[in-house]
């Protein structure tokens, strides 16, 4: 569970499904407003370290956005306290003016003062909706980028001599799916297919740097090698080269 302050009036609390289960809640509990849900919200606020600006607030509103693997709770503080204090409504006339007002005039003045206060709340809700929309767009973009990420990489290395190729092959200790050996324009080209799906993001660059200690990185594509190069080993080239000498 984590909390993020979005603005002076809004907090975002993110809870995993496990967080909910640990507290005896499930997503279905948020679909219908009930006393249990409200008690849960305030219990969470007590559990987290609240910013000072929220400690002495009046009313709090809660907005729940369920996700497949988590729940986002947006907490917005109101500038109007549940127990309305006329002293907080600075736009109200003083007592002498109040005494000269008719009941209708007083009600209209009171409604205007409250409307001015609630304007901030409406703006806060609109701002919150914009924040939610941006966060959803960002999450969707990240998911799309992740789905487009290729789980495999073909490394293509170039060698001037076969002896250099054998030396490199004997240094290979990382896991690979397969490897091929081609010859084209009097040079040897080794393709190595590596599964990077379960490795950290820096791994491909680190692996390439390690390979380049013994070989030249090539800008020739595998399709070019397949079409114009001579195939010397169509699979497990590295394993076969390791057996030499």
Curated annotation (Swiss-Prot):
Protein name (record): Adapter protein MecA
Record-linked Gene3D superfamilies: 3.30.70.1950
Binding partners and assembly: Homodimer.
Domain statement: The N-terminal domain probably binds unfolded/aggregated proteins; the C-terminal domain interacts with ClpC.
Family per similarity comment: Belongs to the MecA family.
Single GO MF annotation: protein-macromolecule adaptor activity
Functional note: Enables the recognition and targeting of unfolded and aggregated proteins to the ClpC protease or to other proteins involved in proteolysis.
Pfam families recorded: MecA (PF05389)
């Amino acid at each position: 569970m984590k909390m993020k302050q979005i603005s002076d009036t809004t907090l975002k609390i993110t809870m995993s499904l496990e967080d909910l289960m640990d507290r005896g809640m499930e997503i279905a509990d948020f679909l219908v407003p009930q006393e249990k849900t409200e008690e849960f919200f305030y219990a969470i606020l007590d559990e987290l370290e609240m910013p000072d600006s929220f400690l002495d607030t009046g009313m709090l509103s809660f907005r729940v956005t369920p996700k497949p693997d988590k729940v986002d709770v947006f907490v917005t503080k109101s500038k109007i306290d549940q127990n309305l204090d006329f002293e907080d409504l600075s736009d109200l006339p003083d007592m002498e003016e109040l005494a000269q007002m008719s009941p209708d005039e007083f009600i209209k003045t009171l409604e205007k003062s409250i409307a001015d206060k609630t304007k901030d709340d409406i703006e806060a809700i609109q701002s919150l909706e914009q924040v939610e929309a941006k966060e959803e767009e960002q999450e969707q973009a990240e998911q799309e980028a992740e789905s487009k990420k290729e789980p495999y990489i073909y490394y293509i290395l170039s060698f001037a001599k076969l002896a250099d190729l054998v030396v490199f092959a004997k240094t290979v200790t990382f896991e690979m799916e397969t490897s091929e050996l081609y010859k084209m324009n009097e040079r040897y080209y080794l393709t190595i297919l590596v599964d990077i799906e379960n490795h950290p993001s820096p791994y491909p660059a680190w692996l390439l740097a390690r390979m380049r200690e013994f070989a030249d990185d090539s800008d020739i594509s595998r399709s070019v090698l397949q079409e114009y190069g001579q195939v010397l080993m169509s699979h497990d080239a590295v394993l076969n080269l390791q057996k030499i000498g």
